[in-house]
């Protein structure tokens, strides 16, 4: 199953929206990201978060409050979707705002349980999370394309053909 998490940062550009929204995935708002998605005309199935930045009056019956203040709304939302069986999660709306939120987004990838391929879509690139418990993964990069590999936790990486 595929899901999109729309965060409360700057709205993604049209090319990201075209790419991600065409994947027949269910859209979830991460707190105030639900309002931003709705403003773009996107149907949001459910709001996930601590609800501190969303107008919950417009979302009656589609709100799941995630109270744990030890984790970010994004980390909690990824955990909920993984528990529900989603195996592909695209995250959008993460650009802009405080620089610390960038680190928080990557930390959410580290904290997320195994079982789902997670991608954060930036205006100029995509961050893909590969969890070591998910087994071997292959990531193909086209000739001449720029890529980077960073291990946020201990792991093993083999690169060939670069």
PLM regions and their residue ranges:
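Non-catalytic positions within long, well-ordered alpha-helices that form the structural scaffold/packing
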Residues: 38-40, 82-85
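Short phosphate-binding loop-to-helix
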Residues: 63-83
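N-terminal beta-strand-loop-alpha-helix module at the start
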Residues: 1-58
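Long, charged alpha-helical interface segments
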Residues: 125, 130-162
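Short, acidic/small-residue loops that bind anionic groups at enzyme active sites
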Residues: 113-128
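Short gly/pro/ser/thr-enriched loop/turn and capping motifs at secondary-structure boundaries
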Residues: 34-37, 54-56, 98-99, 124-129
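Short Gly/Thr/Asp-enriched flexible loops that form oxyanion-binding sites at enzyme active sites
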Residues: 99-111
């Amino acid at each position: 199953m595929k899901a999109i998490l729309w965060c409360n940062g700057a709205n993604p550009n049209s090319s990201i929206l075209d790419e991600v929204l065409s994947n027949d995935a269910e859209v979830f708002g991460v707190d105030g990201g639900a309002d931003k998605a709705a403003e773009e005309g996107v149907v949001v199935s459910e709001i996930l978060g601590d609800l501190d930045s969303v107008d919950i009056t417009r979302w009656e019956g589609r709100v799941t409050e995630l109270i744990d203040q030890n984790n970010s709304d994004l980390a909690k939302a990824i955990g909920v979707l993984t528990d529900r069986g989603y195996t592909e999660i695209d995250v959008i709306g993460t650009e802009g705002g405080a620089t610390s939120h960038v680190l928080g987004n990557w930390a959410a990838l580290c904290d997320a349980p195994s079982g789902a391929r997670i991608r954060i879509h930036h205006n100029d690139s995509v961050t893909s999370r590969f969890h070591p418990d998910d087994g071997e993964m292959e990531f193909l990069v086209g000739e001449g394309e720029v890529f980077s590999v960073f291990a946020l936790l201990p792991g093993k990486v083999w690169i060939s053909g670069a």
